[in-house]
Amino acid sequence: MNLSDYILEFLRKKRVHNIFTITGGAICFLMDAFSRNNKLKYTSVAHEQAAAMMADSYSRFGPNFSATMVTSGPGATNLLTGIACSWFDSIPSLHICGQVNRYELSSFDKSTKKVRQVGFQETDIVSMAKPITKFAYQLKNENEIRYVL
């Protein structure tokens, strides 16, 4: 089982039934995993903020919490208003954002380069999301996924 399949299977076991998403290069492996998992449904939306608001509403009024999956850069930053909405009203939700390849990260190999100097659409979304979430984290390697989820 690869990491993308593991994430979707974890969400299924937590009774997440619908994930709101916009596809993008930084989450293409997660989107591919949907084709191998017929127990989860995803809803493709026109804007990431809509995905976050839909996840909030689904969690607020539905039987289970919901999630979003978006790509890096503007895809991630567009979630912030919806994340804040959930935060202010204590509505549970999970937001998974893609990021540039590990070797393109400004933090890779103790690089002295700043964010956005190496990777396409690299964004420090964790720093932006921390004030409006209970937990915001960027995986450093795939072995952390069990703890992070």
Residue ranges and their predicted role:
Residues M1-L149:
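N-terminal alpha/beta PP-like core and its mobile active-site loop of ThDP/TPP-dependent enzymes
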